[in-house]
Regions:
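CN hydrolase (nitrilase-like) catalytic-core segments centered on the catalytic cysteine
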Residues: 59-82, 150-245
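Short, glycine-anchored, charge-dense loop/turn motifs used at functional sites
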Residues: 3, 100-108, 232-241
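Cys-nucleophile CN-hydrolase/nitrilase-fold catalytic domain and related Cys-dependent amidase chemistry
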Residues: 14, 25-103, 108-110, 176-200, ...
C-alpha cells in the first residue's frame, strides 16, 4: 500500500485552500497514493489563535458541502481520504472532526477530537466540544485505519486504545508550531519532543504512524504562530519512512 500525507501552507482564502488540497490530492494519486490524509482544519488559517464568536460561521455539517466534494473526488480517483473539518453537530455544539472516505465515495468513519488544548494561541476549548464517539479504527479495502487528531498525540492511551481496536496505521492530522518569541529558546526541544512522541507510539503499539502538519507563518490580528511542518511517517519499529521539511 502507498500512502500520502499532504503538508500545506494555508492562506486566508477558504476557496484557495480547498483548491490547493484537491490539486495536491490529484498529484499524490498520480504518484500512486491509495490512502491520503490532509492536515488538521486545512480549509482555513488556524483561527484558534483567537477567541472570536464570528469564527463559528466557519463550521459545517457532516455530511455537508465540503465532505460532499471529497466524497465525489474519492469516487472519481478510487482513493481513500482522511479529511479534517470544523463540524457543526447542532446549535451550540461544535467538534474538531476527521472523516474517512472510502473509494466508493462513502464516509465510513467519523472521529471527533477527544483531547482539546487551551494554551496561549491554541484556544480550542473556546470552539470545540470533546469528542463523543470514542476512539476509532476502520477496516478499509487497503488497511485498518485509526484516526486521532493533533493534541491527542501527547496522550499515549489514545494510540494504545486505537491500536487495540485493530488499527494498523494511525493518522494524526495536526496543526502545531512555535510561538515566534519562544522559538530561539525552546524551538529545537519542542520539535524533538513532537518527533519522539510519534516514534514512541509506533514502537509501543507496533503500528505505522503518519502525522501531517501545516507549515509556515500564520498571522491573525496581532497573533502569530509559525507552524513547523515536519510531517512524518514511522514504521512499527520507529524508523522514519518519509519526512517533510
Amino acid at each position: 500500500i502507498k500512502i500520502a500525507i499532504i503538508q500545506m501552507r494555508m492562506v486566508s482564502s477558504r476557496v484557495k485552500n480547498l483548491k490547493n488540497a484537491i490539486n495536491k490530492i490529484r498529484i499524490a494519486h498520480q504518484k500512486g497514493a491509495q490512502v491520503i490524509c490532509l492536515p488538521e482544519l486545512f480549509l482555513t488559517n488556524y483561527f484558534c489563535q483567537v477567541e472570536k464568536h464570528s469564527n463559528f460561521k466557519l463550521a459545517e455539517k457532516i455530511p455537508g458541502p465540503t465532505s460532499d466534494i471529497f466524497c465525489s473526488l474519492c469516487k472519481e480517483l478510487k482513493i481513500i481520504l482522511l479529511v479534517s473539518l470544523f463540524e457543526k453537530k447542532t446549535a451550540g455544539i461544535y467538534h474538531n472532526t476527521c472523516i474517512v472516505i472510502d473509494k466508493t465515495g462513502k464516509i465510513i468513519s467519523k472521529y471527533r477530537k477527544m483531547h482539546i488544548p487551551d494554551d496561549p494561541q491554541y484556544y480550542e476549548k473556546f470552539y470545540f466540544t470533546p469528542g463523543d464517539l470514542g476512539f476509532k479504527s476502520v477496516k478499509t479495502s487497503k488497511i485498518n485505519i485509526g484516526t486521532l487528531i493533533c493534541w491527542d498525540q501527547w496522550f499515549p492511551e489514545a494510540a494504545r486504545l486505537t491500536s487495540i481496536l485493530g488499527a494498523e496505521i494511525i493518522f494524526y492530522p495536526t496543526a502545531i508550531g512555535w510561538h515566534p518569541k519562544e522559538k530561539k529558546a525552546y524551538g529545537k526541544s519542542q520539535l524533538e519532543s513532537w518527533i519522539s512522541i510519534q516514534r514512541s507510539h509506533a514502537i509501543a503499539n507496533g503500528v505505522y504512524i503518519a502525522a501531517v502538519n501545516r507549515v509556515g507563518l500564520e498571522k491573525i490580528g496581532s497573533k502569530t504562530l509559525e507552524f513547523w511542518g515536519n510531517s512524518i511517517i514511522f514504521d512499527p519499529s520507529g524508523n522514519i519512512l518519509a519526512r517533510a521539511k
